[in-house]
Amino acid sequence: LWTGSTTERGAYQNFGDIFIDFGAAGGNNPRGPVDYRRELDLDDALAKVVYKADGVTYTREYLASYPDDVIAMRFTANKKGKIGFTVRMDDAHTGGQRTVTGNSITISGKLTLLSYKAQLTVLNEGGTLQAGDSTLTLTGADAATLLLSAGTDYDPQSPDYLTRSDWKGKVSTVAARAGSK
């Protein structure tokens, strides 16, 4: 994502920020975790955090998949019903739109030349997922996977740098396809 025009390049822009509050939903925001361990596997693009709190072992895994075009976050616990959080995604740009429907939060907008869309989808195993005005709140789940997909209408082969394909639909399709794996 960048600002600029067809004749002048602008600056790189991020899509936005994802905020996950594990305490707001009565989730796994422990007081004084023990056996805290972080791992980074560069070969598999996997980051992992494991810790114990109140007799429960929590695992958080983060994976960036180029073939699937998603970033995946997976939260698990060794006891049922212990995963809970509130998540929101904020657009980094003024004038963008955020929508929360079903199990997804979407941000979209237009910069000087490029249009963009990012979608965060929550796939919960058990528990209850509730949509708010700007958040999704999960309570009492056994596990949860969050999938982030994003795209723009940029096409470097096009004379005006804009694609004619259904790039917005692809963002939603990518998350659905990755969620089925």
Residues covered by each model-derived region:
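Aromatic-residue-lined binding/catalytic grooves and analogous aromatic/hydrophobic interfacial grooves
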Residues: L1-K181
